Amino acid sequence: MMFKVKVYKRSSFIDKRGYYWTSWKKGLIKNLEFKHDKFSLSKKNVLRGLHGDKKTWKLISCPYGKFFLVVVNCIKNSKDYLKWKSYVLSHKNGLQVLVPPNYANGHYCLSNECLFYYKLAYKGKYADVDQQFSLRWDDPKLNIEWPLQKSKKIDKAKLSYIYPKPILSKRDR
């Protein structure tokens, strides 16, 4: 796969008191000027995305909790068009994922709560919701293997675990 997504490990210090980490240091990524940051707090089983736009770079990290991140290549002429990769980000592993323009991303909260933090770099004005594209989280063409939490209930007719539906926004349904 020719994904342009890059993974970084931020410096951090963890001990019995908690943790301390650096989210960004100038010069880490050349030729990108981050213009603003966003946070999203989610509860367990919340699934957000998949969204993207044509001009924004996103540096994604998890300062609290743990989430499953999916990144999808949406470049139509690419041999990896609609191919996806996944990453588990947490405050303990310190991973950061740089998502380029024309890629969609979405995440699923694995812990009781998780904080999705991202820095945005783009030219011109910010591409707000009306300039973004969305993909269905459960699109069969993508066949994303979301780690939906298994319920302890068993569907005896199907002899399989029942997966609770993820909690979605109106935009993501």
Language model: regions and residue ranges:
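Non-catalytic, conserved peripheral segments adjacent to functional cores
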Residues: 1-92, 113, 120-173
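Surface-exposed loop/turn positions
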Residues: 93-95, 103, 114
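Short beta-strand His + acidic residue motifs that chelate non-heme Fe in jelly-roll/DSBH
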Residues: 97, 105-110
